[in-house]
Amino acid sequence: MSITSSMFDSIKSALAADNESSKSGIADILKTEVGNTYTVRLLPFGKDPKKTFFHFYQHGWNSFATGQYTSALSLQTFGERDPIAEERFKILRTGSDEEKEKAKAIMRSEKWLVNIYVVNDPVSPENNGKIKVLRYGKQIHNIIMDAIEGEDSADFGPRIFDLGPNGVNFRVKVEKQGDYPTYVSSKFA
């Protein structure tokens, strides 16, 4: 099979489109800074409400070669074997002391993604009124779960997804605890 000019152009266009869409995906994530409170509304995924939240695992580490932070999606997200986790545990069990120290630097974290409507972004007001993606960890997940099926469910429940006047805002409060941000003071209001 020989490749034609139109086939090559199609391939080139598809790659360019993939490249552009991957750039916009990162730009769509709401960036938060310590010392600020962001007001958002959670958006349900209308086509398939079961897919409102995307739950995933990732590995992250500072590269020993460049010093840059690097992350990789864990295949455990999709219920598959994870070669990064397997190699890390193998090294921790049987590796040299130097290898064990390097393996300890690889951290696995649990995260979620949800679409949000930005009511107030104090750092980037140009985000106000736009749809973004909130990437969050266990602290915010616990607050959301409490509003859905925990102690606060009687007060909030389905209202956390209601964009109308009966809906509630989610106030994402970013504070500093040690060297890391904490979100424990975030709440629905």
Question: What spans do the regions from the language model cover?
Answer:
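Eukaryotic low-complexity intrinsically disordered regions enriched in polar/acidic
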Residues: 125, 160-166, 182-189
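Elongated alpha-helical scaffolds
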Residues: 162-176
